[in-house]
Amino acid sequence: MNSETGALRRGWTTGTCASAAARAAFEALLGIEPEDPVPVTLPSGARPTFALARLDRGSGFVRAGIVKDAGDDPDVTHGALVLATLRFGAPATGIVFRAGPGVGIVTKPGLPLPPGEPAINAMPRRMIRTALTEVAEANGVTCDLVVEVGIEDGERIAERTMNRRLGIIGGLSILGTTGVVVPYSCAAWIASIHRGIDVARAEGLTHLAGATGATSEAAIRNLYGLPEQALIDMGDFVGGMLKYIRGHPVARVTIAGGFAKMTKLAQGRLDLHSKREAIDFRWLAELYCSIGGKAESGMSVRTANTALEVLQMAQAEHVPIAPAIARSACRVAAGALARADIALDVAIFDRDGCLIASERC
């Protein structure tokens, strides 16, 4: 964080780091002392520079490394060493990409890259090509190169990502569309939702379940016996998931979550994050009284601190608040999906993963 302005500090994508590493490795492969810090051209035209963290020369190859700085974003790859190993390729073969240790291989259809390809996305490939072309043109050589991109300890780090579920095996993905990591950006999560839906559809799955968290995901999987690829890590972005499914349909969609998150959905919120959308306890009190709750209890609902407090009160007084929330959440979700040909339902679970309400929309 900037100590003067309080603004969150931006960082760099794995694609940007791989581009810098590839540039340095190519210069060293040509017998040139690499620039340090290493310049990289971003899609915007900006040219940041990166400290060279590693340079190894071997028989017929050079390996360079850049430490990823994700800024103030809680990125699992922050601090990881991104490596590029370069070798000369056969004449007229151009740039050939390979997955090094810690970078995964695509094994399932539905992703932007076909099965068998290293998980190096389109923009990072373009950025790497740009970096290598700059070096080649400056030195009067061609870009017939084998570029192996790796991430130190990437296979272990990948266990904390969605890669295995998406069919990316063996490590992390080299990502980025702008080259820059925006702290706490929604874009990366929503992109992973889209990729999860794409993979599930390519697998021929017809029933997908979007869950707000690990408890509801495990519960909905057990309830319906769903395969892992049918589970979409929706998080707070129910609106983003439904909008994408509207244009990329499946036969059935289930939305699963806890009582608090589903209360926000019932109130018309399509972004369920606590910092962006708060529960309207006045609305909840009116609902509580409309389904048989006592007036004095309604006053307690209005002044409640948490949704859990309201749920416990309703359970003690036998007021069917969870089914009422499920019905309202269904109406909101159906409006966002806007596809009568897609079966839609909502399931609400308690903190132990027990189903407390469900509704077909």
From Swiss-Prot:
GO BP, one annotated term: methylation
Enzyme class: transferase
Span of the signal peptide: none
Cross-referenced Pfam families: CbiD
Pathway per the UniProt entry: Cofactor biosynthesis; adenosylcobalamin biosynthesis; cob(II)yrinate a,c-diamide from sirohydrochlorin (anaerobic route): step 6/10
Record has ATP-binding as a keyword: no
Keyword annotations of the record: Cobalamin biosynthesis, Methyltransferase, Plasmid, S-adenosyl-L-methionine, Transferase
Reactions accelerated catalytically: Co-precorrin-5B + S-adenosyl-L-methionine = Co-precorrin-6A + S-adenosyl-L-homocysteine
GO molecular function: cobalt-precorrin-5B C1-methyltransferase activity
EC number annotated for this UniProt entry: 2.1.1.195
NCBIfam families, sorted: cbiD, PRK00075.1-1
Family: Belongs to the CbiD family.
Name by which UniProt lists this protein: Cobalt-precorrin-5B C(1)-methyltransferase
Source species: Methylorubrum extorquens (strain CM4 / NCIMB 13688) (Methylobacterium extorquens)
Gene: cbiD
